[in-house]
């Protein structure tokens, strides 16, 4: 049985959590898609100052999404970045989704900033970079929900995933794998988040467009299998 730390960096809000899902359940369900065995999961809430005390006691750690920017002056972010470096040093398989992707990149010295093209929302197609074509045969179709993006590839990693709207959409290296999109998101949850975002920093026109691009099938199972292949390689 693999022991996994799910490090949350935000909450979905009371209404979405009560009617659809919580981040806890979304990440746990996603991890089980490709695990092939039972998981011993422990939840941590980084945005509330709760981090694993000993990362080496876990086989894997996944760092989730957040409305925060990794460059913003929140007190909880520097300890999170420090923990990421420790986890990688301890050879714990360390994975990041969206904000988690950006946090791992920032912890390793990469720049993270807002995209000049604005928001990247709903279904997107992600191609495997030439150096990573052996990871999967076909592109991934996954849900995006971000404006911040990793601007450079940190030393010791390589970019394995890219899209027209996000050049550095995934990083891979010794004991780490990251992904800018949200493979844990379902169309139903994404619709609820988009509707709840009206009147906020996301233009309503962007939300209307995104809502038309949530049909079809998504590659969440393949993404989970990719994660577990990196975990097993690190064990």
Language-model regions: role of each:
Residues 1-75, 79-82, 86-90, 208-235:
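N-terminal beta1-alpha1 cap of cysteine-dependent amidohydrolase-like domains
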Residues 2-8, 13-16, 89, 128-235:
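Amide-donor transfer/coupling interface in amidating biosynthetic enzymes
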Residues 19-22, 56-58, 75-78, 109-112, ...:
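Short, glycine/charged-enriched secondary-structure capping and boundary segments
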Residues 38-40, 91, 109, 139, ...:
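A generic structural signal for alpha->beta connector loops
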Residues 40-48, 125, 142, 160-162:
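Short gly/ser/thr-rich secondary-structure transition/capping motifs
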Residues 48-52, 120-121, 150-151, 167-168:
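A short acidic, often aromatic-flanked loop/helix-cap motif at beta-alpha or helix-coil junctions
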Residues 64-130:
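Cysteine-nucleophile active-site neighborhood
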